[in-house]
Amino acid sequence: MNNHFKCIGIVGHPRHPTALTTHEMLYRWLCTKGYEVIVEQQIAHELQLKNVKTGTLAEIGQQADLAVVVGGDGNMLGAARTLARYDIKVIGINRGNLGFLTDLDPDNAQQQLADVLEGHYISEKRFLLEAQVCQQDCQKRISTAINEVVLHPGKVAHMIEFEVYIDEIFAFSQRSDGLIISTPTGSTAYSLSAGGPILTPSLDAITLVPMFPHTLSARPLVINSSSTIRLRFSHRRNDLEISCDSQIALPIQEGEDVLIRRCDYHLNLIHPKDYSYFNTLSTKLGWSKKLF
């Protein structure tokens, strides 16, 4: 064992037996290396582990130096929204489909993780968004997002009329199916599918991407991440929602606005030493290979 990490948390909700096997392999391997290991409670229950230290995501965030998330990007997003509140590094083993946020190859995870545990890694901070549903600036509901905050109809698809204010200055009004407000991390997710730009993770920027706008002049907009975005609605309806990372939904009631701003805390994401953002883009998006 080394001095870089002493206590390691294992998190991620497995959706199939193969992923659960990775959790068990990781737990037993870390124990043989002499690390203190905290296993998320649900995982320990499903593995039927005996005499193991377990904890919630918050407890892992408070006690561990490193959290290893086993799963796909959805697992990473769900865990990271909580873990980002604490001084803990996070890395992922990809057991999902695309895996933009989960770098480690499950077939070679032990060797890659061994190098990381020896201190051979790249660290970066990814900012989150905070979404508030408020009435007369009185906060009523709040959540955070690592990828994006999305304005959309609750149940039945229909056009929404709304106004967008940036730092309390009117920017534009829009008739569309919704609006995607994305971080650089989320620029390769839902925002990309809607025609938004790809932002490198280190950019202090937020993108606003319209969803099926009812005008050809509506285009994605990139603003400084220090800006505050306010959404106001022309026709008060009770079926609008704000969703965070497609995992948490906040209903919007009549007379309420939505405020979106950068969070005060960051996700401390780490990667193997040979990590390259542009290589990841090329691999995941199927870009053409180098010509010469």
From Swiss-Prot:
Active site annotation, chain numbering: D73 (proton acceptor)
Catalyzed reaction equations: NAD(+) + ATP = ADP + NADP(+) + H(+)
One GO term (biological process): NADP biosynthetic process
One matching Pfam family: NAD_kinase
Molecular-function annotations in GO: ATP binding; metal ion binding; NAD binding; NAD+ kinase activity
Its EC number(s): 2.7.1.23
Stored NCBIfam families: PRK01231.1, PRK03378.1
Family under the similarity heading: Belongs to the NAD kinase family.
Name the record gives this protein: NAD kinase
Organism: Escherichia coli O1:K1 / APEC
